[in-house]
Amino acid sequence: MSFFDFLKQPDVNQGVKEYQRASGAVLLDVRTPEEYRSGHIPESKNIPLQTIDRVGSVAKNKDTALYVYCQSGARSRQAAGMLKQMGYTNVNNIGGIAAYVGKVER
């Protein structure tokens, strides 16, 4: 990874497209339940960062493709690191819903 790759911000819109193409993938919203209720990307599962260890309830297989987002990208970056430490091998930090241009559910 180059220095410039590190600076590149995840693109939530591209990440959602990749999620939609991935068979058996899980879209994780790691914001608080209150934030999730205020509007979330359709089909996403709410597993707040503080309870990320409960991810096994939605992704039992460690090879499951996980697409992780939050509000701005900071918590999703942290959650992605934690998921990798837990042994998940296909973790994708897609950034923050603040940049999302698609439909949201409430």
Predicted regions and their residues:
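Rhodanese-like catalytic fold shared by cysteine-dependent sulfurtransferases
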Residues: 2-18, 22-25, 33-65, 74-106
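N-terminal glycine-rich beta->alpha transition that marks the start or flank
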Residues: 29
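Short, surface-exposed ligand- or partner-binding patches at beta-edge/loop junctions that are enriched
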Residues: 69
